[in-house]
Amino acid sequence: MKKIIFLFLVLISFKVSAQEINIIPQPAYIDKKQTQKPFIIDSKTQIVVADSTLIPSADFLNDYLQKYYKLKLTITKVTPGRNFIKLISNTRISEFNDAYNLITTDQNTTIIGTSKFGVFYAVQSFIQLLPTVANQLITVPSVVIVDHPRFDYRGMHLDVSRHFFDVAFVKQYIDYLALHKMNYFHWHLTDDHGWRIEIKKYPKLTEIGAWRNGSIIGLWPGKGNKNIRYQVMPNEIKITPNDAVIKTDGIRHGGFYTQEQIKEVLDYAAKRYITIIPEIEMPAHSMALLAAYPELGTEPNKKYTVAETWGMMNKYNNVLQASDTTFKFLENVLTEVMDLFPSPYIHIGGDEAAKVWWKQSAVSQQMMKANGLKTESELQSYFIRRMEKFVNSKGKTIIGWNEILQGGLAPNAVVMSWQGEKGGIEAARQNHKAIMTPENTMYFNHRQFVKEDSLAANKFSPLIDVYNYEPIPTELNAEQAKYIWGAQGCLWTEYITTPAKVQYQLFPRLDALSEILWSPKDKRNYPDFQKRLKTQFKRYDLMGITYSKRYLEN
């Protein structure tokens, strides 16, 4: 019997030593020890952690092993003679932030990070060395990995306004980001289509603003609706009674997160070293807010309703009044938001505001006159600067979509460039941090294929285009390029109604994004990435992720 077991282990060791190491994102350096036996994880393997700050990484690994391999390991401070996974923090191993070394032998695994973050990222690479099938011997190939991130900001966004997703799925989404070494989660909490965060001072935001009476059927403009021009251009308001009649499915949709639930999600993300950036949209995209508090609009006597169709709702006037009353309201909202979220960054939107409504508002015109503002673009800048001053007074920094450049950029603002790269380039040239998220490649709600399997936004962002995106524009010199903080994928949910559809739209484009942001530029190779994806897909099968399987056809 012993001889049979020995031969079995020898066969396993040859199989593992010969296997390819397919990690996404691609590490900076990998040395495969092809002649060495694998490290075998069994019930006697221990996770060694002497530094208490590394416990979250140990717990994450242990939870993963238990969930997918039905194996729970002992966590200890004492290093045994062999058969252990040791987590260590040592700032001297690399000049790079959040770097790590990962060394596996047949006796043990040693993970050394320059920080607790680096250790956590090493754990994610270690997980990708595990078998993609649960019911077999858990072997890890002998390897040395030396790695570090390329960009400091590695972000992913989720819109929960157009369609609401519960706490359990938001946590799952955060796990997806963690497994891909992402470190920022942009949580789009408010928009025309629903207000999703409890604000205790203003309960009607969730009593009224969190619910809509229906959603259009199919692609915009929706089944039975005319393709009306609904985006207001400067000096142009053409709206008829028929424009306001929208046919929908008549199904009430909504939901919101209580502040206690927000805290629960924040705690969950913190243990995965992901910073959550909340977005509170202003001055436009405010139909849900105005449905609850119409007095804050430029037409205070109008009956607003939470939006039931997609796209920009500025034809129906979704812009907040530029008044002291509005500013005080927003300050109170942001106070509660900032008290909840430890993030040093607060996203305040700033996009797609139809300034024509300010042009026709006596109150807004008076605000312009009182502050020496000549144009409505300057009023937008004043609006953003005023909110920035308040946010800065609380020790935090604002992020805004690239429209916040209009009329002059607020002094400390970070620009999120979605309308191509122009906004990011302009911000970097003004010595402001920029996050690149151009919609043609970074919007994962777009179709992945010319003929999609299911309903998706009528734009095309295939995997190869995502993978080949380079966040640093060639127009910038070396000094300006330092202000490109990183990039972000965005997932808008007009046509994404279930967790399975989120997964389908996200994977494998999130894999491509992670490699853009983590791996050295000279390590990126699309054919090699495609090869590594085959192993990643097997892992997704193990995890029950509904990825886009059409990529397996190629």
Q: Model-predicted segments: where are they?
A:
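Flexible loop/turn segments at secondary-structure boundaries
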Residues: P56, F164-D166, D192-E198, P283-L289, ...
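Flexible, acidic glycine-rich loops studded with aromatic residues
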Residues: T397-E403, G408-A413, Q419-N554
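Structural detector of well-ordered beta-strand residues that form the stable sheet scaffold
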Residues: H186-H188, I277, H347, I399, ...
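Bacterial Sec-dependent N-terminal signal peptides
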Residues: M1-N22
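Active-site neighborhood of glycoside hydrolase catalytic domains
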Residues: L289-E295, E299, A307-V414, W418-Q430
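Acidic, contiguous N-terminal accessory segments
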Residues: V16-R154, N392-K394, I398-W401, L405, ...
